[in-house]
Design a protein with these regions (language model features):
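Interfacial segments at transmembrane-helix termini and the short loops linking adjacent helices
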Residues: 27, 31, 91-108, 290-322
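Interhelical loop/hinge segments that connect adjacent transmembrane helices in multipass membrane
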Residues: 132-137, 159-166, 171-215, 255-268, ...
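Membrane-water interface segments that mark the loop-to-transmembrane alpha-helix transition
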Residues: 1-14, 36, 45-90, 103, ...
Length: 401
């Protein structure tokens, strides 16, 4: 509930950003920012390496040692990602890429310098059940970032208004999480072995990278195949259509995994999670899809009215997305990250192939393909979880009757 309220607040503030950039920036400028954001988000997925989840799942007597090892891994990993992103920007510039995109990628890299000093505290806070406070911090950071984006768009209408606030709000996040759950580490604690982190983390890391590709690779393909203007239109359609569902899915994955880990009846908890999440999101996105022809030109302006059909289609893709998010959390809680990785990779490849094949037909064709592929691929990938949550429980009740 806390994460849901947080996402509602962030989406409300994000709406003002969408309205501002639609009126202040050209589709090409938005497309340039979208390309940088897509590249940055794919690289940022590498921070989701399962280290924090090892802290959440650690036994009490191993906690200090686990945190000590985790802190070292976080620093090593984030500094490495900073270097990689700087190298990507330099390489992109060297091969003749847009100077503005290079600068935007460099700005996004600055986030990695703040993250490692607070990631252990975040995991410990989640372990302690401080979900409401974590949600408030995450939501507060995004709201402040969105307010800054609107202010910058008014005084400095350029692509960087969608990027710079991420870096400017990173210190707020760091100070807040360190204050929420202070932890300095015990110098006498014996660090746990790194191998368990690697054994668990490789699959989780692969999952998160593939998940980021599922969310962002189509945007890069649209930019490469159709140009920055088409990417700007596609990016705005996604923000107006699937943005709500994407945020809800992120919040759901954050809270459902620890809930399933702690549950004595995992099947019942999964069944409750699927039923509740679909019950909440499905009516909202259906209404959103129906109203898109009215609210898109009203909010974004008449110049963007052509996007209303694409927005309506993409709204409906939220339903299979939320179903798959619940199933993926169950697989991870069951210790099946490799199965989740395989399923996520297949879904991602299907969506990328859809974009590549339908790009010549335009954005509406891509959107219809995205919806169809999402419904089929994500439902098939979620079948093991659906079986555990519903069919197995039904069989057990019939046997006991």
């Amino acid at each position: 509930m806390a994460f849901g309220a947080s996402e509602l607040a962030t989406k409300a503030s994000r709406l003002f950003v969408v309205i501002a950039v639609a009126r202040m920036l050209s589709p090409s400028e938005i497309g340039i920012a979208a390309a940088a954001l897509a590249m940055g988000d794919i690289l940022k997925a590498l921070t989701e390496n399962g280290v924090g989840q090892r802290i959440i799942a650690a036994k009490d007597h191993d906690l200090e040692g686990t945190c000590t090892t985790a802190r070292r891994l976080f620093w090593f990993w984030c500094l490495g990602l900073f270097a990689v992103q700087v190298a990507v920007a330099a390489l992109f510039w060297a091969i003749g890429g847009s100077v503005m995109i290079c600068l935007l990628i460099l700005v996004l890299a600055g986030e990695y310098l703040f993250m490692p000093a607070g990631l252990v505290q975040v995991a410990l806070a989640m372990r302690a059940g401080k979900m409401r406070s974590i949600a408030a911090i995450a939501g507060g950071q995004v709201v402040i970032s969105n307010i800054l984006s609107v202010a910058l768009a008014i005084v400095w209408p350029a692509a960087i208004v969608l990027i710079l606030p991420r870096l400017l709000t990173a210190p707020f996040w760091l100070m807040a999480v360190r204050r929420l759950h202070p932890w300095q580490g015990n110098p006498n604690a014996h660090p746990t072995a790194i191998r368990p982190f690697l054994t668990f983390g490789w699959a989780v890391l692969g999952i998160e990278v593939v998940k980021a590709l599922r969310l962002q690779a189509d945007k890069l393909l649209v930019g490469l195949l159709l140009g920055p203007q088409a990417l700007g239109l596609y990016f705005m359609a996604f923000n107006a259509g699937l943005s709500l569902a994407s945020s809800f899915s992120v919040a759901l994955s954050v809270v459902l995994f620890p809930h399933l880990c702690a549950s004595k009846d995992r099947a019942a908890s999964l069944r409750q999670g699927i039923t509740l999440s679909l019950g909440l999101i499905a009516p909202v996105v259906v209404l959103q899809a129906v109203l898109a022809p009215w609210y898109v030109p009203l909010l974004l302006g008449d110049d963007w009215a052509q996007l209303s059909g694409v927005v309506s289609i993409l709204c409906l893709a939220a339903i299979p997305t939320v179903l798959w998010t619940s199933a993926a959390s169950w697989m991870r809680a069951e210790g099946r990250p490799a199965q989740e990785l395989k399923a996520t990779a297949l879904v991602t490849l299907a969506l990328m192939l859809n974009t590549f094949l339908l790009a010549p037909l335009g954005l509406t064709a891509i959107a219809w393909g995205y919806l169809l592929v999402s419904c089929i691929a994500m439902t098939l990938a979620a079948l093991p979880a659906l079986n555990a949550a519903f069919l197995s429980a039904t069989k057990e009740r019939l046997q006991n009757a």
